[in-house]
UniProtKB/Swiss-Prot annotation:
Subcellular location: Cytoplasm
Name listed for the protein in its UniProt record: DNA replication and repair protein RecF
Summary of the function given for this chain in its UniProt record: The RecF protein is involved in DNA metabolism; it is required for DNA replication and normal SOS inducibility. RecF binds preferentially to single-stranded, linear DNA. It also seems to bind ATP.
Species the sequence originates in: Mycolicibacterium vanbaalenii (strain DSM 7251 / JCM 13017 / BCRC 16820 / KCTC 9966 / NRRL B-24157 / PYR-1) (Mycobacterium vanbaalenii)
GO cellular component: cytoplasm
InterPro entries per the UniProt record, alphabetical: DNA-binding_RecF, DNA-binding_RecF_CS, P-loop_NTPase, RecF/RecN/SMC_N, RecF_2
Family assignment from sequence similarity: Belongs to the RecF family.
GO biological process: DNA replication; DNA synthesis involved in DNA repair; double-strand break repair; SOS response
Length: 386
């Protein structure tokens, strides 16, 4: 798989750019702040409908513009698919597949399968559980695009159930049974959608675990062994996940039971205390949790191992995913650079950003595309250096 064409309109610092890309290695070279990472971000957005840098879409739209457009042509086993994404702040994104509108932007998921390595990856180890949940859900969605709808439905249930909890707390003291009966209905929705999401995550963790262990050993052969496991606030869910069980019906029953037991606490606090939105992917080195105990080098090795494991899972399922490397070589020591370069050598397409040529492995035969900035009527914009 490779991206043959990338076009951006009013995306971040790019007013307009069209790039013809090729299989093999391409390096975008430019000073920090010149917009090279924005190219990688646009490709990642096309692959996942999310940014690796910001949580909302508003920053993706160039100042003064109403919307941003990301267009790609992806080649997979000789077949071309064109994807156009219209990004508008505060409204649902619109998408076209081979120039025909689709009902939901989620329908383009799976067209571009990519794995991203970025400086932000350290947050996978050192950050909040939300970073690791996002890693699991993005990878699960890349492999099985229907999971995006499961996640969207679950998030909607959590929002509506949280709003109900805030009002139902007072209703309980007034003896209003209607609000509590409505809460029971939403408990069923949360358990149903939550069980599907947990099942997808647990299946993924089961497949990821041996790949993470192997990748970490490659990156840090003298270090402690790496391991991952799914953590849940529901004891039954955690125990079954640890045993490799991903049965949806069992998870649904466990969630319903936990919701029943935590009802008073939820009404008291007005928040959802049960569900996969509170779960975590635990990363371990030897007998210690990586977060808080891993050194800087160990943290980088663990973060890279998670990405390399994702790449391997996607690769064995079909064609190689596109490798996106955003300024990571500058962050790594020589051993980790060499291990990452080894994997990149086998990929069908690798797209890399670097501030200076010296950040790229010397032995790489790669196409260089220079990125610079210039003044325009609308302010400073990124351009390809000619």
């Amino acid at each position: 798989m490779y991206v043959r064409h990338l076009a951006l309109t009013d995306f971040r610092s790019w007013a307009r750019v069209e790039l013809e890309l090729e299989p093999g290695r391409t390096v975008f070279v430019g000073s920090n702040g010149f917009g090279k990472t924005n190219l990688i971000e646009a490709l990642w957005y096309s692959a996942t409908l999310g940014s690796h840098r910001v949580a909302s879409d508003a920053p993706l739209i160039r100042a003064g513009a109403e919307r941003a457009v990301v267009s790609t042509i992806v080649v997979n086993d000789g077949r071309e698919l064109a994807v156009d994404l219209d990004i508008t702040s505060g409204r649902a994104n619109k998408a076209r597949l081979n120039r025909s509108p689709v009902r939901s932007a989620r329908e383009i998921l799976g067209v571009l399968r990519a794995v991203l390595f970025a400086p932000e990856d350290l947050a996978l180890v050192r950050g909040d559980p939300g970073e690791r949940r996002r890693y699991l859900d993005e990878l699960a969605t890349t492999r099985r695009p229907r999971i995006a709808a499961v996640r969207a439905d679950y998030d909607k249930v959590v929002r509506q159930r949280t709003a109900l909890l805030k009002t139902a707390s007072g209703a309980r003291y007034r003896g209003d049974r209607g609000a509590l009966e409505t809460l029971d209905v939403w408990n069923g929705h949360l358990a149903s959608h939550g069980a599907q999401l947990i099942s997808a995550r647990v299946q993924l963790v089961n497949e990821l675990a041996p790949e993470v262990e192997k990748a970490y050993q490659l990156l840090a052969p003298g270090s402690r062994p790496a391991a991952i496991r799914y953590r849940s606030g529901v004891d039954v869910v955690e125990a079954e996940a640890a045993a490799g069980n991903s049965d949806e019906e069992m998870f649904e029953a466990a969630l319903l039971d936990a919701l029943s037991r935590r009802r008073d606490a939820e009404l008291e606090r007005g928040v959802c205390l049960v569900g996969p939105h509170r779960d975590d992917l635990e990363l371990r080195l030897g007998d210690q949790v990586a977060k808080g105990f891993a050194s800087h080098g160990e943290s980088w090795s663990m973060a890279l191992a998670l990405r390399l494991a994702a790449y391997e899972l996607l690769r064995v399922e079909g064609s190689d995913p596109v490798l996106l490397l955003d300024d990571v070589f500058a962050e790594l020591d020589s051993a980790r650079r060499q291990a990452l370069a080894q994997v990149a050598a086998t990929a069908e397409q690798v797209l890399v950003t670097a501030a200076v040529e010296e950040d790229i492995p010397a032995e790489w035969d790669a196409r260089r595309i220079g990125i610079t900035m210039q003044d325009s009527d609308g302010g400073r914009i990124s351009v390809v250096r000619t």
